[in-house]
Amino acid sequence: MRVRKFKIKIQSQDQFRDDVIKTWKMTEKGKPLEGDYDLILSFPDLSWLSKILSPERLRIIQTIRDKKPESIYQLAKFLGRAPANVQKDVHDLAEYKIIELKKTRKKGQKRESLHPEYNWDGFDIAV
C-alpha cells in the first residue's frame, strides 16, 4: 500500500516561483512531485504556518484521525468547542486539502451533513 504524505514548506516568494517552474517542468516530463509527495503546501513564513496549523487545528486533525467523527457537530462535541468555531477551522483545513469534507446522509435524515476525514499517513515540514 502506498503511503500518502504531504509536505509543508516555508519559503520566500522567489523560492516559491522557482519551485513552481521546476514542478511544472517535472510534471510535463511525467516525473513525480518532489519526494513523491501527493501535495506540497508553501507558506512565506512561520506566522502563516502557525495560523493554518495552530494547536487547536492540530487537535482537530488528531481527533478526526483517531475518533473518526461522523459530522462537524460530533467533532465539536469531542473537542468540547463551539460548533461554529470548529466549522470555520475545519473549512480552512479543507481549503488547504489537509482534511476532506464528504457529504453524507444517514438513513432517515432529511439533510446532509459534512463528514470530516483525514486521509494522510503523515506530513513533513521543511523550514
Feature map (PLM): residue ranges:
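Short amphipathic alpha-helical interface segments
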Residues: 55-68
